A protein has these predicted regions:
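Acidic, low-complexity intrinsically disordered regions
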Residues: 1-263
Length: 263
């Protein structure tokens, strides 16, 4: 990799650190260490992604920014995923998990963590589609959609807020929620309340506001789910803290295009 390429990639990561308020995690020495770890592999890996995913280089480049984060997928495993639209939703869900796992593992061998809304099954170090298929095959899709309640119980408290309070958060966390419907079996504002709670908690920690980010991705074509995610996206209190999309490959791109300012 040429010095010019190293400089360009370094600036790309610096811009992301500033835009996403990650300075508490990445002083200059640590950023240099991150770059050294991926140095000679970047051009070839980016070319491979553009070919395999049929996306422009700017979208593939966003994958490199993902190396700054620990990625947690929070997955809706309610009954409608299995039975609505003749199983299409479950296929889409499996595909998205595979895309995220591949993307996150391209420049960081740790892989991603997966937590399910209802099932006690879980996965860590998930790196590719094969890992995803093995994990999803163990999950029984059933029940309602207590999306916000278990977002806090299964993801935010044990994996974000708890470690932030005790100074054990190694990287900022990107929580990607995959769902097919609006929440059910919990208070209407449970999702928004869980997000606000986690933002408040990490903001009081030494890591600051950038310690957690949220992405919501819809599978299926349920209009109520679309309306719910749109309402989250436009919420005056948290809309600038999250990003919602139904795009398959571009959702990571949209996340990195968004800024910390209200839209």
């Amino acid at each position: 990799m040429t010095p010019q390429q190293v400089g360009a990639y370094r600036q790309l990561l610096i811009d992301t650190i500033q835009e996403k308020n990650l300075q508490g995690f990445y002083p200059p020495q640590r950023l240099d260490h991150v770059l050294q770890g991926m140095a000679n592999e970047v051009p070839g890996k980016l070319q491979r992604l553009t070919h395999e995913w049929s996306v422009p280089m700017e979208v593939a480049t966003d994958v490199m920014k993902l190396s700054l984060f620990d990625v947690i997928l929070y997955v809706d495993d309610s009954g409608s995923i299995e039975f609505e639209e003749r199983g299409v939703r479950k296929d889409q869900l499996r595909q998205i998990i595979g895309i995220v796992a591949t993307a996150a593992s391209t420049f960081d061998e740790d892989g991603i963590s997966v937590r399910f809304m209802n099932s006690m099954e879980m996965g860590d170090g998930i790196r590719n589609a094969e890992d995803v298929d093995m994990l999803v095959s163990r999950v029984r899709f059933q029940g309602l959609t207590p999306l916000g309640t278990n977002l806090r119980n299964k993801v935010l408290d044990p994996m974000v807020v708890g470690p932030a309070r005790t100074g054990r958060l190694n990287k900022p966390v990107l929580v990607i929620t995959i769902t097919d419907g609006q929440p059910a079996g919990e208070p209407h504002d449970a999702v928004a309340d869980s997000i606000r709670y986690s933002i408040d908690e990490v903001s009081r920690s030494r890591y600051g506001r950038g310690a957690v980010s949220f992405q919501f991705t819809q599978v299926g074509n349920d209009t109520r789910a679309r309306d719910f995610l749109s309402a989250l996206d436009e919420d005056p209190m948290i809309g600038n803290l999250i990003d919602c999309t139904s795009s398959k490959y571009y959702f990571l791109h949209f996340f990195f295009l968004s800024t910390s300012e209200p839209s």
